[in-house]
A protein has these predicted regions:
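Sec-dependent signal peptide recognition
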Residues: 3-11
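Surface-exposed, glycine-biased beta-strand/turn segments
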Residues: 20-144, 151-154, 182, 235-240
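Acidic, glycine-rich catalytic/binding loops that coordinate metals and/or anionic ligands
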Residues: 21-27, 32, 40, 157, ...
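Histidine-centered active-site/metal-ligand motif
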Residues: 83, 150, 166, 206-208
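Short histidine-centered loop motifs in beta-beta connectors
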Residues: 91, 97-98, 150, 156-183
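A residue-level detector for short acidic-glycine micro-motifs
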Residues: 106, 166-169, 191
Length: 240
């Protein structure tokens, strides 16, 4: 009987000692994300040290902006969504280059902006849905855009693609399937896909640039779940 009581006491004692260790597990918010390009959890993430090569700034001379609203994760209440890219403040018709070599997936050089009433109609739909539908985002709000597949050449962990949006024009003859080299001019910055584009004026020109990482678990965007105080510095490390 005494041995049984000692056994039960021992189990309870050890269990009581072990239990507090679970509270020491770090939450996603507590993990130091310095140098991470995105962080989903302790298995799905990408650190700058895991890149095989660095990228070029897509709008040469225009650095990663300081203003947090121009970086990933910023709210986009006008379309019931959030920002998944970096807005480089390049002026109208400024040359835009491929940040890395790859194969063109999309090049919609003949895309034309809808009129402002139709534009607002799509924004109203987004509001009613409570998010930005993929079709409205990709085929209306990105405007003229080029998408480049980089395969696993940027990192072995994820397939990577870059997206260059709101272009005023796309390099003549550039079509899906073309191979582009790092630094090739793929178009000129503009405001297509924006309200200014719908109004057919020259205001608000910039390059909206996105970088996505794909694997079997899903798609993740540059800056995803990175705190705002680390975001700019982490993204800057991506470029030469």
């Amino acid at each position: 009987m005494m041995n049984k009581q000692l056994y039960i006491f021992g189990v309870l004692f050890l269990g009581a000692c072990a239990a507090p260790t679970s509270s020491l597990d770090l939450t996603n918010e507590q993990i130091d994300k310095t140098g991470y390009l995105f962080y989903q959890n302790n298995e799905i993430n990408l650190h700058i040290s895991e890149l095989k090569d660095k990228l070029l700034l897509p709008a040469e001379e225009y650095a990663v902006p300081d203003y947090i609203n121009l970086l990933p994760n910023a709210k986009r209440e006008y379309r019931s969504g959030h920002h998944m890219g970096v807005d480089f403040s390049s002026p109208m018709n400024y040359p835009i280059r491929a940040a890395f070599g790859g194969v063109v997936v999309r090049s919609n050089a003949h895309q034309k902006d809808v009129d402002i009433d139709t534009y607002n109609y799509f924004l109203d739909l987004s509001s009613r849905v409570g998010k930005t539908p993929d079709d409205i985002y990709n085929f209306i709000l990105l405007g003229r855009s080029v998408v480049i597949d980089h395969g696993y050449d940027i990192t072995d962990k994820y397939r990577a693609i870059t997206v260059y949006s709101h272009l005023s024009s796309i390099t003549e003859g550039l079509v899906a399937g073309d191979i582009v080299q790092k630094g090739d001019i793929i178009g000129l910055s503009g405001n297509t896909g924006t309200s200014s584009g719908a109004l057919q004026n020259d205001k608000g020109s910039h390059l909206h640039w996105e970088l996505f990482f794909d694997d079997k678990t899903g798609r993740y965007f540059l800056g995803q779940n990175i705190p705002s105080d680390l975001l700019k510095n982490n993204i800057e490390q991506l470029f030469n």
